[in-house]
Amino acid sequence: VSDLIGTELTDDIQRVRIEIGAGLVEIVPADGEQTTATLEVINGSAEDVTFKVTNGELVVELTKQFARRGPEVRVHIATPATLDARIKTGSGDISSRMPLGEARLSSGSGDIRVEQIAGSLAASAGSGDIRVGSSVGTVRASTGSGSIDIGEANDSVGVTTGSGDVRIGDAAGPTTVKVGSGDITIERIRDHSVVTSGSGDVRVELTEGPSVRAETARGDVQIGVPDGLPTYLDLKTVTGQIRCDLEPGEKPADGEPSLMLRARTVSGDITVVRV
């Protein structure tokens, strides 16, 4: 049984606060200048869900706790605005094709996909993936068994996964990545960074420093260093091999950019290449 509760047209929504179990939440661009919020409840009734706007905040939440499986709730928001968002789902996907401001997103077993964050982001998923196109502010993201993909981060980043891969495109701020079992790939590092994996490969395609620490217990480490950047190396592996393409150079002058690179692995190879 599908009960379509209705559509609310308003132009004064600045924030959304949504907490549902099963279902989905999606935010898309609007054709006009108004925000349209549509709610659909499946296997439930209108009385099961609060759906209202108060002081510029759209609120969607279940009105009671369900002993068994509750209704499936689908929330569709079309807006021209950059909304602040606090969204939590049990098993539903969260997606936004519009920029979000300050965002706190959480899902138990759904995926989180956001194209752009204008503020800061805190995102967590139990067994789903997290995808972020770009972020202006800080990013904190964690998954239990899903992957994390961040295209562009202009501020600090802290991400952790239990058993998923991590990919970051451009990391402009301080970056920390911790993975239990999975690969880490970062295309460009521009600030102090620490990346560690329990069992997986660590690959940094281009690192501009000023310091990078890359560690894995069972996996390979590969780091790309710009040609001509003075680099201090501290490389250690127990049973693997070390290959370094960098040429010995002079100590950098005072104020000259340099890189401190530390890499560790127990049973893998370490490769440092010029790029």
Residue locations for each model-derived region?
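Intrinsically disordered, low-complexity terminal regions
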Residues: 1-275
